[in-house]
Amino acid sequence: MQPKIKLHYVTYQTFPSKKANTLQTIGNLKYLSKNNVDSTLIFPLRKHESSSNESTLKKVYNYEVDIKIRGISHKFPFGKTSKFERLFFLMSHFLWSRQISRSIMKKSEEGIIFFTRSEWVFYYLSKYDLKVTYECHQLSKLKKIIIPISIKKPASKIIFLNEELKIDAKIKKVYDSKIQILHNGVDEELFKTKVQKDRKRVIFSGNLSRFNTERNLDFIIQSFADPKLSDFNLSIVGANESEFALLNKNIEQLGLSERISVEKWVDREQSIKRIQKSSIGILINSENNLHSTKYTSPLKYFEYVYAGLSVVAVDFKAHRVLPNSESISFFKNNDKSNFINAILNASSSSFSSVGLNEFTLDYRAKQIIDFIKY
């Protein structure tokens, strides 16, 4: 067996959290560790509930492999107050990234590979000529300045979640060998239990809002009032307290309580069971955010497909560039008739399991290792 790669995953995310991006981070680290990578997660303790306790994170994220955990003190304002949240995030992210990068530069052992979702960590570790790979999930005006500067360093690389991110980052072609396009993936171990499917059950699973913007689930609920969908049931899984109350009120007013159920957030294992029980999975987002329309590579898509669901998705470019997108039934945003036809089309389409291995986090981890180790 080859010597273990030592990887330090440095991120401004905090743990534990119900956010999908933390599931993605832990999932990647889990399968990197399974593929002979000595992994360390380094993150700020920027919330009251933040914890670097390994047992706590293993329980929340349901993993057993060895991932070293380093929670770093966070003395900056973001996470301490709800006021000026966006400003404090930008300022605190910059200051913490500079602080941790300087600390890493002073103490870094030879042979460590760094991996990050933070553009500022990428910038500073690149500046210090350390071997670092940046996984880019979205873009901003600031990132479009920082990323092209950082990639010029010889030991710096970038993974983009889809082709649109790479195009819009406008990095010179001379650096193409240092760039990889790699979508999200699914943790196949969560699908070991077989569940009987309900052929008429449709599901939306996940956070009901993104970047403090609702995902337009009211449109989905109102569409289910149409007689053409009277044979179908809808499950919505992942509501917080206020969303749970509001959606149930709307459902009751429409007389749909027998066909539409809303559940609060459930753990990952229970969420997967509900997906497995369903036959159609919905991908929907607000059109008011560029990340949602163009850049996202949603974890739920890979879970839906791996569980054997047909997928119905709002017709955004981000969904068009997903792997196997030719099998998705698309609908125009806010077009009820189009959505209903997409559900009916998905219900009559057959699922193909060909190529499912390439949807897994194990496959993704192997691709990451091959990319970063040289």
Annotate the PLM regions.
Residues 8-10, 159, 186, 195-224, ...:
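Conserved donor-binding/catalytic core segment of Leloir-type glycosyltransferases
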Residues 11-19, 37-92, 122, 239-243:
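N-terminal strand-loop element at the rim of the active site
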Residues 164, 185:
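Carbohydrate-associated surface elements
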Residues 189-192, 333-334, 341-374:
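A charged, aromatic-enriched C-terminal amphipathic alpha-helix characteristic of glycosyltransferases
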Residues 205, 233-247:
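Glycosyltransferase donor-sugar binding loop
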Residues 238, 246-275:
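Nucleotide-activated donor-binding/catalytic signature segment of Leloir-type glycosyltransferases, i.e.
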Residues 275-294:
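Acidic donor-binding loop of glycosyltransferase active sites
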Residues 281-283, 303-306, 310-313:
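Short hydrophobic beta-strand element within catalytic cores of glycosyltransferases
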